[in-house]
Amino acid sequence: MAVTAALVKELRERTAAGMLDCKNALVEANGDIELAIENMRKNGQAKAAKKAGRIAAEGVILTKVANGVATMIELNSETDFVARDEGFIAFGSKLIEVASANKINDIETLNDSVVDGVKVSDARDTLVAKIGENISPRRVISVEGDNLGAYVHGGRIGVIAILQGGDEELAKDIAMHVAAANPQFVKPTDVPAEVVAKEKEIQLDIAMQSGKPADIAEKMVSGRMNKFTSEVSLTGQAFIKDPSTSVAQLLKAKNADVINFVRFEVGEGIEKKEEDFAAEVAAQMAAAKK
């Protein structure tokens, strides 16, 4: 079968691949567009597998609250530029919808889920081949509760807040506060004993180095430890929208309590590859001479 311009155009529209790639694929498939797509998809998957080894530390956080379920996903890319790509954003939107509908809590289940008749893992491979970067759903969580709030700041920090009592506005305000203040625990009493002991050791050392007597240093540190546990816990912090009141006071006034919260930040815990620009240029120049 002849490879026509119309066939090349159709293949480009269906695969988003380059014109030359589409023409070559059609020639190899003797004009059979379905076979060409199959071959290109196989090729795309091979490229995706190769790119999967790259570090994906940029990306976006997505949240959704519906039907008593709050869901949050971190979807990673290699660069911030791709994180703003329409195809990347559309893929993320589909992921959050399927994760919310099925209350998904692990990446394996998410990758095995189906969107638009295609497995998420296959859709991801196709997108990687199209965009040319490693793309990876990194983590997902779905929680149920009576009063759920979600907040995303700049696409990079996302929070789910689980409350008992209060209203929707309060739940969202608490999620917003967690995004901004980054508390490590819900209440001061939740701070583990080993964390308190370590901080006390540090503060005692600081006090003793300042020349304070041991008994005075101990009293000073006791006051500092109360401040420390308040600063690292949600309810002990000053409310971000009204610093004159604490989060604990706000919750009491609203007859509410925070059961828990979950905070995602894009790329946290991922060690980004440090690029040596001079070495990269030298390598490119050496390759060009070959």
UniProtKB/Swiss-Prot annotation:
GO molecular function: translation elongation factor activity
Listed CDD domains: UBA_EF-Ts (cd14275)
This protein's record includes keyword Transmembrane: no
UniProt superkingdom: Bacteria
Primary localisation category: cytoplasm
Keywords: Cytoplasm, Elongation factor, Protein biosynthesis
Segments for region (Involved in Mg(2+) ion dislocation from EF-Tu): 79-82
Pfam families listed in its UniProt record: EF_TS
InterPro entries: EF-Ts_dimer_sf (IPR036402), Transl_elong_EFTs/EF1B (IPR001816), Transl_elong_EFTs/EF1B_dimer (IPR014039), Transl_elong_Ts_CS (IPR018101), UBA-like_sf (IPR009060)
Cytoplasm as UniProt keyword: yes
Subcellular localization(s) per the UniProt record: Cytoplasm
Gene Ontology cellular-component annotations: cytoplasm
Function summary: Associates with the EF-Tu.GDP complex and induces the exchange of GDP to GTP. It remains bound to the aminoacyl-tRNA.EF-Tu.GTP complex up to the GTP hydrolysis stage on the ribosome.
Family: Belongs to the EF-Ts family.
PANTHER family in alphabetical order: ELONGATION FACTOR TS, ELONGATION FACTOR TS, MITOCHONDRIAL
Listed name of the protein: Elongation factor Ts
Classification lineage: Bacteria, Pseudomonadati, Pseudomonadota, Gammaproteobacteria, Alteromonadales
